[in-house]
């Protein structure tokens, strides 16, 4: 009961109104990115993961292969924020082309170094391990509180989040919020509460109704 109360209190501290909405969708061979053009960033991405991992050498150059004006590489320079992957590069390391597609400007959000290299990375590794025995749909993105923190013209998400849907169990098995702070913490929640905070539906059950392992 205390944990539920804590989650609700944390969510109440994040505004529910005036949130950014998806206005552009970008799909490549690896994932789909749901972008807001005002932000110049993805609100979230979605991809299927089964037996993730491999030996491909990690790419290093980020690319904008669209005509959209997106947050660019130069804006990150001199900041204390990492370029945090949404669709994780290592998840696609079994195919070097797919791996390279994760280095797109619409597949990252600014994350504190301690988040990106800490509990976020741990979560990525745990999900990839799960994918060795189950086919998963991954939804991962950010949420911007008010007032926005803005660094070099980049609006910084207050939180990042992950939802994992098991295609074999036909249910959400992970729904986690990560606070994008210098001392990052995570909290487990449920899909309904997350969508209430975001102000839009992820259509998890609609998307996966006809999918099979």
Regions found by a protein language model. Give the residues of each.
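Cleaved targeting-peptide boundary
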Residues: 17-25
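Domain-level detector of nuclease and nuclease-like folds
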Residues: 66-213
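Sec-dependent N-terminal signal peptides
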Residues: 4-16
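Short, His- and charge-rich active-site/binding loops that engage polyanionic ligands
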Residues: 24-82
